[in-house]
Amino acid sequence: MLGSPFEPQCGDRLSWPREKAVADANVELVAPLDCHTGENPLWCEERRLLLFVDIPRGVIYGYDPATAKCDVIVRTRVTGGFTLQEDGSLLLFQDGCIAVLAKNGTVSEGARNACPGNERFNDVIADPEGRVFAGTLGGGKGRLLRFDTDGSVTEMMRGIGCANGMGFTPDLSGMYFTDSFARRIYLFDYDRRSGNLSKKRTFAKIPRKIGLPDGMTVDAEGFVWTALWYGGRLQRYTPKGKLEREIFFPAKQTSSITFGGPGLHEMYVTTAANSEPDPLQPPGYDVTMHRGGGLYRTTTEGVTGRPEFRSRVHFAP
C-alpha cells in the first residue's frame, strides 16, 4: 500500500457518418497506465478523485483531475469491483471474499467465502437503499447476488456467462444488467423497497462483429452508455433501446464508464491491455491493434451524469 487511500502521494454501425457520431466528443488519455484489466471507474465527490481498479493485480488507483496525477491507492488481492460506502470507506469485492478499505488506509476482512472458489466477483453496484448487487463469473456459471445492508446475501440469478455493467432508470423502477457473453443488456423491473427484480427482458443486443457489452452507466437524461470490449467505443442508447450515438477510442478494449469531475460533465473510461486469447473475439479481430490499459476522459455537449448511490452494507464481526 502506498500512502493514504484517499489522499494520493446494440445494432450495426450508425446510419450517419462516423464523423457525426463523434463530432462533439474530445477523447484524451489522462493516465497512460498498462492495466491488465482496468475497471470499475467511480467518482468520489468529497475527495475529487476518480477511483478505478486493475482487477487481477488488485491495484486501486485514484486520478485527480485538478493535478492530472494518478496515484496508487492500495495494492491488495484480485478485486472485481468496489462501491463507496456511506461512511467514505470502500467495499472491495474480491476473489472469494469481501473486504473494507477504511479511510485511514487499513484493509479489513468483511465477509469470508462470499463467493465459491470457482467464481469471482466481476462487477458491482450500490442501489438507492444501500444494498449491493454483485455479479460473478466462473466457467459460464456466474450469478447475480444481492447483499443487503445487514450483510445477508440473496441469489437473484444464475447461469450467467459473464456478469457485468449495471445501472438504474431515473425513476428507480428499473435496473439494467449486462451479460457480456450473451452480448445483451437486460432490463428488469426493480422494487426499491424489497430489492427484488422481475420481468427480465432484453434492452439491447450487441452484434458479435463489433464487440461485447461491458461496463455501463446511465446519464442524467436516462440514456444508457455501454463500453464495448473489442469494440473500442462507447454506445449511447435511448431509454427505448435505440442506438443514439457512438464515441470511438484508440484503445480496442474499452471496459467501463462513469461520469465525474465538476458537475459530472466528464466521462471517464477504463481500458485493458489484456492480450489473452479469447474465443469471443469478433470475426477478423485484429490482434495487433492497441488494446488499452490506460484511463481516458471524454466530454460531449449537453450530456451529464448522475451521482452513483452509496452502499451501507455491514458484516457481523
Regions found by a protein language model. Give the residues of each.
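A short beta-strand motif characteristic of beta-propeller blades
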Residues: 26-32, 68-74, 108-114, 152-158, ...
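Beta-rich, blade/repeat-based domains predominating
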Residues: 32-47, 76-94, 115-132, 141-143, ...
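Residue position within the beta-strands of beta-propeller blades
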Residues: 51-53, 92-93, 133-135, 177-178, ...
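A short loop-to-beta-strand structural motif that recurs across blades of beta-propeller domains
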Residues: 59-61, 97-99, 143-145, 184-186, ...
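Short loop/turn segments immediately following beta-strands, especially the blade-tip
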Residues: 188-195, 300-304
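Blade-level signature of beta-propeller repeat domains, shared across WD40, Kelch, NHL, RCC1
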Residues: 260-317
